[in-house]
Amino acid sequence: MISSANNKGAGTSRRKLRSEKAALQFSVSRVEYSLKKGRYCRRLGATAPVYLAAVLENLVAEVLDMAANVTEETSPIVIKPRHIMLAPRNDVEVEQAVSRCHHLGIRCRP
């Protein structure tokens, strides 16, 4: 019989989240819930939410990087909603991806 003193921590591992397995910051479970709730399809593959979470994370990182560049040009310290709104205008691909987004509550001139 093995004593519990020799076996500390052996059976206490916690489940690894899908976001952790894919090394993502965005929650795969929340993306999956949104896809199911939106009824975009009858059935959903296991890797579809993981892929979409990775795409969203990449897009957000790209926009924040461009917003940081806009912020450095205008010389404030904090990234503001205006900087995030103006950032995609410098890149054609990101502009096309974000062109249909509604900036709710943001009222500023370009």
Curated annotation (Swiss-Prot):
The lineage of its organism: Eukaryota, Viridiplantae, Streptophyta, Embryophyta, Tracheophyta. Core component of nucleosome. Nucleosomes wrap and compact DNA into chromatin, limiting DNA accessibility to the cellular machineries which require DNA as a template. Histones thereby play a central role in transcription regulation, DNA repair, DNA replication and chromosomal stability. DNA accessibility is regulated via a complex set of post-translational modifications of histones, also called histone code, and nucleosome remodeling. This is Histone H2A.1. One of its GO terms (molecular function) is DNA binding. GO terms for cellular component: nucleosome; nucleus. Expressed in the generative cell within the bicellular pollen. Not detected in other reproductive or vegetative tissues. Gene3D superfamilies: Histone, subunit A. It is found in: Nucleus; Chromosome. Belongs to the histone H2A family. It comes from Lilium longiflorum.
